[in-house]
């Protein structure tokens, strides 16, 4: 988050100040990439397309930092849904994925994760074990920091559905993490024995 | 609900990783982003002004629709009074435009009639035969594809259209109010916005009184007045005095 400076930075960026824009970009792009990584691939491309759209609309944007984040992530989601459609079209399965869902879940893998020093990419991969909506809502709520109503609008669900998805998602993640922790400490113990 | 799961200590390492500061790799795209930012600066003013003008267009359309609806209310009464007061033979002009589209029922048809007749009735009659009925859709479609409306408004065909609408700036609203026979109306300005609003108040007024006139009666009265309603005004052709402002 940029915080107090945000209004000033945004207005400077709006008038063409590249340094100000770079600050906005640096602040948000990592989170944006992590969010877009829920699709599993092409996060960089989709992020670049997102910024392309954002810079074109920047002069007309009005709002505070939360509104800014909501706007950027709404744009990102549209691009991600488009990219998802292209993928399914390329896979010659146009009838699938009509929901507009673009998140691809993953099965648990057996990679050894050192839980205390997870990379953000590994963390996103763990989140992707959740059902798509839960994964997306958890990231938007907990990592991007959007409100329930903003997330609801963004994903096209009711606030109630978003609350439930966030709650269950976090519960599921806690379970995954504690199981992972057990597995890891077990294997660590085994290694010490042998 | 149980305690907020976000407080579960098992989640802490995961959340920490998800919220971790940017990795080097995640900042790689900055150059490309700044380039597109720079490119957008060059083209930025036009988009924003276009957006502004679109807002005005929409506002204008809304306003036009409102005026049309008002005109229907007042004009409907006026027309009824007019009809009952005068001999049908002597005043075919009032109905001409209305009868041109008796098949296309509905509120917007009534609204369209009113926008033209609600104004100085003489001027409006001049337009009736051309810009109402089936021709209107074609004209509106053509209009929606014209880039320079200022110039286009002076073309003979569009002159009738703008006259019917009450000005080139009102054509979009007028076209939007057309019944969607060929679906052409939606091709104009803000598709979603227009059709929703006004028509509900409209239908009360007219339909019963409309069919009296025969379109065939119209032409004789027509040529006396010029349909030029373009705001820019062609002084050479016609003084813009007959401008139907939509005030009944």
Regions from the language model: what does each represent?
Chain A
Residues 2-6, 90-120, 147, 190:
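Internal acidic/polar
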Residues 3, 10-34, 41, 135:
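A short, charge-rich alpha-helical start-of-domain segment used by transcription regulators
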Residues 11-15, 38, 49-68, 86-90:
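Sigma70-family region 2
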Residues 13, 32, 36, 43-54, ...:
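Short, small-hydrophobic-rich alpha-helical interface motif
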Residues 15, 104-139, 144-154:
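Amphipathic alpha-helical segment used for protein-protein interaction
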Residues 27-30, 38-39, 139-147:
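Short helix-capping/turn signature of helix-turn-helix
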Residues 38, 59-63, 73-98, 116, ...:
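Arg/Lys-rich amphipathic alpha helix in sigma70-family domain 2
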Residues 77, 81, 134, 143, ...:
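DNA-recognition helix of helix-turn-helix
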